[in-house]
Regions:
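Active-site-proximal beta-strand elements of phosphoester/diester hydrolases
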Residues: 52-56, 92-95, 155
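A short glycine/serine-rich beta->alpha loop
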Residues: 61-67
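A glycine-rich phosphate/pyrophosphate-binding beta-strand-loop-alpha-helix module
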Residues: 69, 73-76, 80-152
Length: 162
């Protein structure tokens, strides 16, 4: 999320993100959007300012230790904050990273779970939680690199909500 926030702050300083909400939040970014609302009073449509949240959550360590539960609670944590702010979470994306999951189990680092177990368990945990609450996941991508053998990267799980 730091990469995204740094880019947003730079663009805002350059005057290119006038619709970005300025806050102390470090795990999310929000933009202000005008929304036309038909009120029940019959006075016709009214324009209101709403926030679109882009929320990030990481659960690298929990996912590395217990992949299913770590990834499930990652998604749960990512939706918790928008919901507590009276938001509505309507989709998520999952971009994660790991070392080569096709490596032999003999190549697993001592004291670590095999990459294959982490990758498959995390994918199952994430999809299980999302399916149980009815959250659509529009993007799932897994990046493999040898340097990721020390930890499973579960950043970002980013629900998009309003």
């Amino acid at each position: 999320m730091d990469i995204a926030l740094m880019a947003m702050k730079k663009l805002r300083a350059e005057g290119k993100l006038d619709d970005m909400e300025v806050s102390d939040e470090i795990n999310a970014c929000s933009i202000v959007v005008p929304v036309e609302i038909d009120h029940e009073d019959g006075k016709g449509p009214v324009m209101e300012e709403w926030l679109v949240f882009f929320k990030n959550e990481t659960h690298n360590h929990p996912t590395e230790i217990e992949p299913f539960g770590g990834a499930a609670t990652c998604l749960g944590g990512a939706i918790r904050d928008p919901l507590s702010g009276r938001g509505y979470v309507y989709q998520a994306m999952r971009v994660t990273g790991a070392a080569d999951p096709t490596k032999s189990l003999k190549e697993t680092l001592e004291g670590k779970l095999p990459q294959r177990k982490i990758v498959t368990g995390a994918a199952s945990g994430y999809s299980s939680y999302g399916n149980q609450i009815g959250l659509a996941t529009g993007l799932v991508d897994e990046i493999y690199h040898p340097n990721l053998s020390l930890i499973h990267i579960s950043e970002p799980t980013r629900p998009i909500s309003i």
